[in-house]
From Swiss-Prot:
GO terms for molecular function: histone binding; histone H4 acetyltransferase activity. The lineage of its organism: Eukaryota, Fungi, Dikarya, Ascomycota, Pezizomycotina. Catalytic component of the histone acetylase B (HAT-B) complex. Acetylates 'Lys-12' of histone H4 which is required for telomeric silencing. Has intrinsic substrate specificity that modifies lysine in recognition sequence GXGKXG. Involved in DNA double-strand break repair. Transmembrane segments: none annotated. Residues 44-46, 207-209 are annotated as: Interaction with histone H4 N-terminus. It comes from Neurospora crassa (strain ATCC 24698 / 74-OR23-1A / CBS 708.71 / DSM 1257 / FGSC 987). GO terms for biological process: DNA repair; subtelomeric heterochromatin formation. One of its GO terms (cellular component) is nucleus. The active site is at 284 (proton donor/acceptor). PANTHER family: HISTONE ACETYLTRANSFERASE TYPE B CATALYTIC SUBUNIT. Keywords: Acyltransferase, Chromatin regulator, Cytoplasm, DNA damage, DNA repair, Nucleus, Transferase. Residues 387-399 have a biased composition (Basic and acidic residues). This is Histone acetyltransferase type B catalytic subunit.
Length: 508
């Protein structure tokens, strides 16, 4: 290819997504944003060859997300025998419906033909009021033509905002297993308070995996017995036990940083908590931002449930001098019953429970991000020293230390099981050091999330939002608590092993 850098353009910078509405002069732009990723579309380097002054404007009608692609440039590379400018329309035709390539005039005409009483496709699930207005959530199946049409228009957002994300195959024979949730901002029309416009804010896709449930054991069963399964011709597959997986989850940039992701996730979770065939709600390859949002939402919900609140550290458990960590630090039967009731996968439930139990530790031993007098307090916690938390750290009692050690062993036991293969490659001393290092990282992360939970709880009170709108306050993770570097030091954390065994924190 040509070595002239002037002919290369960043696809992330060149591509602009615009949300528009019809106006007397054509279209009015409401919001614009760039994609985070274009590597799945334009290649790993996210570069487009063959243009100078390139602009790719993907316009969307803000309501029904009717797309229109406009490509403009100042100069185009003249093709040679060896190379030519990239055909942008051809590349994007694999990600956009044919209607996206209509003339601008046809696009504007279509916008004006959309009725004032247009509503999103699917069934209205719920509505709620946020700080910036009213929102509605709709759900539907891809087998609904209107749902399929909207999804087909917006699927390019997946490679735009999910690294490595791929659109749903609309022709898959199992397409009926997908359920789509759309989030819309509902706004009253100017001078027409009884009429509303809808503005697309985000969506999520969920897929059902059928889950075989073995029959209960009986005394009469013999080793030669084989379970049988038969259905009549009218059997509804939707009634089979399943694991429902959140596959894609996108809030578009103009609606981010408003707490809408947490709201949508919580609404979806509540829907499947009531959905009898679903035995677990799982998440496919979440990124760090989604992990944080999910952790806080799960913590907010579970910490209000009596069954979850009843899960406590049994301080009567004795700590062995050597050997395995005790398995009865928390009642395992109650743990599993609670997890199944709330349909959360084992690893995620364990993490949220560990976080909650950490918030319940005696103040003298509860880890945090440091105290206000520490030099790095503001950097670590994101709080101003002037906002207080001047309370002195109480001296831990032997009982306090015992409780903390039990909690630490509970967490380390899970981390060891999760990383058994990697840790098994290390010598005993290195294994302990590596496990201590991972534990300290998990402990730090929990402290960070508990601070977020506390601050979101305070914001909910200040904004006057209804109960459940935000994460409730939890015991402070930075109110004069032991600094985590002290915990690391106490645990003998060392540098990473030269054997480079990959040991993970075990996030779901």
């Amino acid at each position: 290819m040509s070595g002239d850098d002037d002919w290369w353009t960043s696809s992330n910078e060149a591509l602009l997504v615009s949300l528009v509405t019809p106006s007397d002069t054509g279209v009015k732009t409401l919001d614009t944003f760039h994609p985070e990723y274009t590597n799945n579309i334009f290649g790993e380097k996210e570069q487009i060859f063959g243009y100078k002054g390139l602009r790719i404007n993907l316009q969307y009608n803000a309501s029904d997300m009717l797309p229109n692609l406009k490509v403009s440039y100042k100069k185009k590379y003249q093709p040679t025998a060896d190379e030519e400018a990239l055909d942008i329309n051809e590349v994007l035709s694999e990600f956009l419906p044919e209607i996206a390539f209509q003339k601008q005039s046809d696009f504007e005409t279509r916008l004006k033909s959309i009725p004032d009483n247009w509503t999103p496709p699917g069934t209205l699930v719920t509505s709620f009021t946020n700080k910036d207005g009213e929102y509605e959530v709709y759900s539907g199946k891809i087998t609904d033509p209107a749902v399929k049409q909207l999804l087909n228009r917006i699927q390019i957002l997946v490679p735009f905002f999910v690294d490595g994300g791929t659109p749903i195959d609309m022709e898959d024979p199992d397409v009926d297993r997908w359920t789509i949730y759309f989030l819309y901002n509902k706004r009253p029309l100017l001078n027409q308070p009884d009429k509303f416009s809808y503005h697309f804010a985000g969506y999520s896709t969920l897929y059902r995996y059928y889950a075989f449930q073995p029959p209960a054991e009986s005394e009469s069963k013999t080793p030669t017995d084989t379970p049988t399964f038969s259905v009549d011709g009218d059997f509804d597959l939707d009634t089979l036990p399943c694991r429902t997986r959140i596959s894609q989850f996108i809030i578009i940039p103009p609606f981010q940083q408003k707490g809408l992701g947490s709201r949508l996730y919580s609404i979806i979770y509540q829907q499947y908590l009531k959905h009898e065939p679903t035995i677990e709600l799982t998440v496919e390859d979440p990124n760090e931002a989604f992990d944080d949002m999910r952790d806080l939402a799960d913590l907010a919900f579970l910490s209000k449930q009596p069954e979850f609140q009843a899960l406590k550290i049994d301080t009567s458990v004795e700590i062995p001098e050597e050997g395995k960590a005790p398995s009865n630090i928390v009642d395992q039967a109650a743990w599993e019953a609670c997890r199944k009731k709330f349909k959360i996968v084992p690893r995620q439930f364990a993490r949220v429970l560990e976080m909650y139990l950490m918030s319940q530790l005696p103040e003298s031993v509860r880890p945090g991000l440091g105290a206000p007098e520490d030099e790095d307090y503001e950097e670590q916690s994101g709080r101003s020293k002037s906002k207080g938390h001047e309370k002195a750290l109480p001296k831990p009692t032997p009982e306090d230390e015992h409780t903390y050690r039990l909690w630490m062993m509970l967490v380390k036991r899970r981390l060891y099981v999760h990383n058994r293969d990697a840790l098994g490659q290390l010598e005993l001393k290195e294994r302990r050091e590596e496990l201590a290092k991972v534990f300290a990282g998990v402990e730090f992360d929990y402290a960070r999330l508990l601070i977020k939970a506390e601050e979101q709880g305070k914001l909910a009170q200040a904004d006057g939002e209804t109960a459940g709108d935000q994460v409730p306050a939890t015991p402070s993770a930075a109110n004069g608590k032991r600094k985590l570097d002290e915990v690391e030091q106490a645990e003998g954390t060392a540098a990473a092993s030269s054997k480079k065994a990959k040991v993970e924190s075990g996030h779901a």
